[in-house]
Regions:
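Periplasmic/ER-lumenal interhelical loops and adjacent helix-loop junctions
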Residues: 1-3, 163-213
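Generic amphipathic alpha-helical segments used as scaffolds and interaction surfaces in large
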Residues: 12, 25, 116, 120, ...
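Aromatic-residue-lined binding/catalytic grooves and analogous aromatic/hydrophobic interfacial grooves
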Residues: 143
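Short hydrophobic helices that act as membrane-entry/anchoring signals
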Residues: 14, 135, 209-212
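Generic detection of long, well-ordered alpha-helical segments
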Residues: 15, 27-28, 146, 197-201
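Membrane-helix interface linkers and caps
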Residues: 138-140
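Juxtamembrane segments of multi-pass membrane glycosylation machinery
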Residues: 1-22
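Membrane-embedded helix bundles of polyisoprenyl
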Residues: 25-41, 45-134, 147, 151-169
Length: 213
């Protein structure tokens, strides 16, 4: 999505930036997203509120923002909302769940951080497997199939506005430090420098701070 192309997720992000700073807006959306997920998991409103605040204000989000990983935090902030939509579609209302999924997934994809999208697919697959087993035990495979098809459709709708940007990312990825190698040396066994890869990662004793606001 170029500067002159207005899409739904781009318009939403742009509108929210008028209301608050980008960093605060991203953390707010992370809290809202996790709050909705907690509600879809039948948590009491107060518990859902605490869960949302804890997720949004987690140390890892603040660390990533301060390190300049803005698109990563934007992508992470939408992930609970996507899972909420999938769960709501299977357990309550498939149309409502599909709408929630399409909204949050379009916002997530617009962030254009494919590493986080890759992780999100694993989470969705885990939820899907659990729901498939539950549907099998309840004899509701037909309902599961219809809901799954609807969610796939909502994913395609969410993908369409950001497809040009994703295509551009794919084209230019070959010219980055993480793209294809331009040096043919069979003796080289190392990739990126370890310090470069783990510069902003937690040490072994720090991982608990990821869930402490």
């Amino acid at each position: 999505t170029g500067a002159g192309i207005n899409t739904f997720p781009k318009t939403v992000w742009g509108f929210l930036r008028l209301l608050m700073s980008p960093e605060i807006m991203t953390l707010f959306l992370a809290m809202l997203s996790a709050y909705i997920l907690a509600l879809c998991l039948k948590a009491p409103p107060l518990v859902a509120l605490i869960a949302g605040a804890t997720f949004g204000l987690g140390s890892i989000n603040v660390l990533y923002l301060s390190a300049g990983h803005v698109t990563k935090v934007k992508a992470i902030s939408m992930m609970p909302g996507v899972l909420a939509g999938v769960i709501y579609a299977f357990r309550s209302n498939m149309w409502g769940g599909a709408a929630i999924t399409a909204f949050f997934l379009s916002m997530h994809i617009h962030a254009n951080h494919l590493q986080m999208t890759y992780y999100l697919l694993y989470l969705i697959a885990a939820v899907g497997i659990c729901e498939l087993v539950a549907a099998q035990l309840k004899g509701q495979i037909k309902s599961f199939t219809i809901t799954s098809a609807l969610l796939i459709g909502s994913a395609l709708v969410a993908l369409s506005p950001s497809f040009p940007g994703l295509k551009m990312t794919k084209d230019y990825s070959h010219y980055t430090t993480r793209g294809e190698t331009v040096i043919q040396n069979s003796e080289r066994t190392e990739g990126l420098d370890t310090d470069y890869i783990l510069e902003y990662s937690f040490a072994k004793a720090e991982w608990l701070s990821a869930i402490v606001p």
